Amino acid sequence: METSVPGLTGVGCATFTQRPTPVCVAVDEYLSPFLLGRRVSEIEDIWQSSFVSSYWRSGPVLNNALSGVDQALWDIKGKLANMPVHDLLGGKTRKAAPVYVHASGDTFEEVIEEAREYIAMGTYSGQH
């Protein structure tokens, strides 16, 4: 997301792998009027007005589009405050988080090798 300040941008993920084009259209054509001329600090009001004004409320296309915009606004706000977003949202609550990795390969041996690489990276603790 671009701002009126040169070089100040925000990044957000609006991934909807089955329908990327409608998400782009939702951002460009539907959400843009809710964003233009607004202050980054108005994140909650932007979200609420965008969400409740929509005919497609709670649908996957709008939810993905709005999620990406919301993330980008928080990214911009963090840059303006010179703080990581997690500090803006209350601070770090843990040193690490569980992750899921998927080993793949053309042969069973390749899968085993990739799994060993993930284990060596520390992605498996043996706990759930």
Language-model region placement:
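N-terminal amphipathic alpha-helix/helix-capping segment at the start of soluble metabolic enzymes
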Residues: 50, 78-79, 83-96
